[in-house]
A protein has these predicted regions:
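Mixed-charge, low-complexity intrinsically disordered regions
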Residues: 1-172, 204, 217-304
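Conserved hydrophobic positions within beta-strands
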Residues: 176-178
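Residues that form ligand- and interface-recognition hot spots within folded domains
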Residues: 180, 190, 215-217
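Short aromatic-glycine-enriched beta-strand elements
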Residues: 182-186
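Short, structured beta-strand/loop micro-motifs enriched in basic residues and often containing a Trp
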Residues: 188-197
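Short nucleic-acid-contacting surface segments enriched for D/E, G, S/T with interspersed K/R
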Residues: 198-214
Length: 304
């Protein structure tokens, strides 16, 4: 794989960092206690016997990454590496509630690809690590806990930057504005954010479609690689003929839906309401149920 300069937004290690939430602080405190005892192998810092070598072997190798666009490959590698860390963290008693929720939802929705399941692996993995959060004022996710631990451990800033982008990502509803060989041009509803994003499936799409996808920001400084990445298989919305406004386009139907939902959320602006809704829905399982119940059809690279 060719080398590219990765944005080193966080160049200073945070040696005194204690974590943003109570779970992360407990995880870091436990790690600190073991590190002070000179137990420096993280594989030994756990409850039970964790096979760190076997987990590390599951990370995608550089030969496989050579087939990816550089930006996409960077995120695939980062997600694989972060998954290894999460697989170890999830065994700790401090993370028990999130771990239980993760396992329960995995069993209930059995992510795969239609016709086996409309919940794709790419969707569920990102949702369960970044959007599934604890209750209370300090909402923590598996990704946020992993990122906080990496900040404390002074993980390489380039890799940490990718971890942070994964953690902070969310789904969004985008209007298809046209596509070419590699890229799709999208405009997000409500935020009106216009982006050029790498397509990561063979589905070209059609102008005017609405895509429900997780789009990641450019990871590189280089201008010629400054494109976003569509990180999940597109869910393509089609008009709801049972909707009470059947004369409206699918976009108009969603805008009416937003008008009804946003006032019920305790946020200040429509953009904040939209971002909250995209990440958390109206309940923990809201978007999983939405995808499960809304499934109509699929083709290679897109689900309707």
């Amino acid at each position: 794989m060719r080398k590219s300069k990765i944005n080193k937004r966080r160049s200073k290690p945070i040696t005194s960092f204690k974590g943003r939430g109570p779970i992360a602080r407990k995880v870091i405190a436990t790690a600190k206690a073991h590190l002070e005892k000179k137990v420096i192998d993280f594989a030994n810092w756990k409850v039970g016997k964790l096979n760190a070598q076997a987990l590390e072997a599951s990370v995608i190798d550089h030969n496989e990454l050579a087939d990816f666009d550089l930006a996409h490959g960077a995120y695939v590698y980062a997600q694989n590496k972060m998954s290894v860390l999460i697989e170890q963290i999830i065994e700790l008693p401090e993370v028990q509630k999130l771990a239980y929720a993760y396992d329960e939802l995995m069993a209930d929705y059995t992510p795969a690809y239609p016709p086996m399941s409309s919940i794709t692996v790419s969707y569920f993995t990102s949702w369960a690590t970044s959007d599934l959060v604890t209750q209370g004022a300090k909402k923590e996710s598996l990704a946020s806990i992993a990122v906080d631990f990496c900040r404390y451990m002074q993980v390489d800033s380039s890799l940490l930057n990718l971890y942070e982008n994964l953690e902070q990502s969310r789904m969004g509803i985008y209007r298809h504005e046209g596509s070419d060989t590699q890229f799709v041009h999208l405009t997000e509803l409500i935020t009106n954010r216009k982006i050029k994003a790498l397509r990561t499936t063979d589905y070209l799409g059609n102008v005017g479609e609405l895509w429900f996808v997780r789009v990641l920001p450019p990871p590189f400084d280089a201008a010629h690689m400054g494109h976003h990445v569509v990180f999940t298989t597109p869910y393509v919305f089609v008009p709801n003929r049972n909707y009470d406004s059947v004369d409206k386009s699918i976009e108009e139907q969603w805008l009416v839906c937003f008008e009804r939902i946003f006032p019920t959320l305790t946020v200040d602006t429509p953009v904040q309401a939209y971002e909250h809704f995209m990440r958390h829905g109206l309940s923990r399982n809201y978007w999983l149920e939405f995808i499960f119940l809304s499934y109509i059809n699929h083709e290679d690279g897109a689900i309707f």
